[in-house]
C-alpha cells in the first residue's frame, strides 16, 4: 500500500513528459518559419510577374 502513491506520482510524471519527434529529419526538411517565408514571398513574386507584361505571360520569361 505504501508503494501506490509513489507509483501514481511516477505515472503522472511520465505522462507529462514532453514528446519526442519520432520521424527523422530528411534532406528536404523545412521548418515552419521557412514555410511562412515561402508563403509570404510567393505572392510578391507573382505580382512582379504580372506587372512585367499585362497582356501575356509569355513575355515574362
UniProtKB/Swiss-Prot annotation:
Where does this protein come from, organism-wise?
Conus ventricosus (Mediterranean cone)
The cellular location(s) given in this protein's UniProt record come to: Secreted
Gene Ontology MF term list: toxin activity
Q: Which InterPro entries match?
A: T-conotoxin
Which keywords does the record carry?
A: Disulfide bond, Neurotoxin, Secreted, Signal, Toxin
GO cellular component terms given for this protein: extracellular region
Secreted recorded as keyword = yes
The superkingdom of the source organism is Eukaryota
Return the protein name.
Conotoxin Vn5.3
Keyword set includes Secreted: yes
| UniProt family annotation | Belongs to the conotoxin T superfamily.
- Which range is the signal sequence, renumbered to this chain? 1-19
Propeptide positions in the record are 20-50
Matching Pfam families = Chi-conotoxin
Supply the domain comment.
The cysteine framework is V (CC-CC).
For this protein, what post-translational modification is recorded in UniProt?
Answer: Contains 2 disulfide bonds that can be either 'C1-C3, C2-C4' or 'C1-C4, C2-C3', since these disulfide connectivities have been observed for conotoxins with cysteine framework V (for examples, see AC P0DQQ7 and AC P81755).
Q: In which tissues is it expressed?
A: Expressed by the venom duct.
Amino acid at each position: 500500500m505504501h508503494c501506490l502513491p509513489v507509483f501514481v506520482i511516477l505515472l503522472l510524471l511520465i505522462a507529462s513528459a514532453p514528446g519526442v519527434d519520432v520521424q527523422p529529419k530528411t534532406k528536404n526538411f523545412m521548418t515552419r518559419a521557412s514555410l511562412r517565408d515561402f508563403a509570404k514571398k510567393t505572392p510578391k513574386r507573382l505580382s512582379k510577374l504580372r506587372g512585367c507584361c499585362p497582356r501575356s505571360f509569355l513575355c515574362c520569361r
